[in-house]
Amino acid sequence: MQLVVARIGRAHGIKGEVTVEVRTDEPELRLGPGAVLATDPASTGPLTIESGRVHSGRLLLRFAGVHDRTGAEALRNTLLIADVDPDERPEDEDEYYDHQLIDLDVVTEDGTEVGRITEISHLPTQDLFVVERPDGSEVYVPFVSEIVTGIDLDAQRAVIDPPPGLIDDRAEIASARDAGAEDAGDEA
């Protein structure tokens, strides 16, 4: 099975290093020197990691055969993909690989069907489930414990407790100040 472990960002310097957006909790295992990674698009790989270092809180990698800024820039936005055992699980029981979550049914705590997870969107602040609703529309569900209250891989479902307005049109006013501002606007 293949697992996306990183996305290549901008070139760093003139000697072929690139910044990397890490998408694995085990970068030392998956992104170490000598690791051979498949790529998406496939035409840019496979890539062999020659060296890696952390600079200003960012992981920088250099790949075999890429020795200048031009070569590094050509790799920008390439996904790095590692082969993993399909039965491998993350060490933390509350962590999941994307492939484990794709195609899970999403229901609310009261059992109401929301849809099916079609994609995991990895953003800088949090991950999002992209959920396809029965009518074909999409809803984005933040993958945070306050909203995603349970994942049952055996039952193939994710249980959510969405705040009003996340999956419907029943948004509530966030604060009393906002409520006061709306009331004042009604008087004008």
UniProtKB/Swiss-Prot annotation:
InterPro entries: PRC_barrel-like_sf, PRC_RimM, RimM, RimM_N, RimM_N_sf, Transl_B-barrel_sf. It holds the Pfam family RimM. It is found in: Cytoplasm. The keyword Chloroplast does not apply. GO terms for biological process: ribosomal small subunit biogenesis; rRNA processing. Its main location: cytoplasm. Residues 93-166 form the PRC barrel domain. One of its GO terms (cellular component) is cytoplasm. Keywords: Chaperone, Cytoplasm, Ribosome biogenesis, rRNA processing. GO terms for molecular function: ribosome binding. Belongs to the RimM family. Binds ribosomal protein uS19. The PRC barrel domain binds ribosomal protein uS19. NCBIfam families: 16S_RimM (TIGR02273). An accessory protein needed during the final step in the assembly of 30S ribosomal subunit, possibly for assembly of the head region. Essential for efficient processing of 16S rRNA. May be needed both before and after RbfA during the maturation of 16S rRNA. It has affinity for free ribosomal 30S subunits but not for 70S ribosomes. This is Ribosome maturation factor RimM. The lineage of its organism: Bacteria, Bacillati, Actinomycetota, Actinomycetes, Kitasatosporales. The gene is rimM.
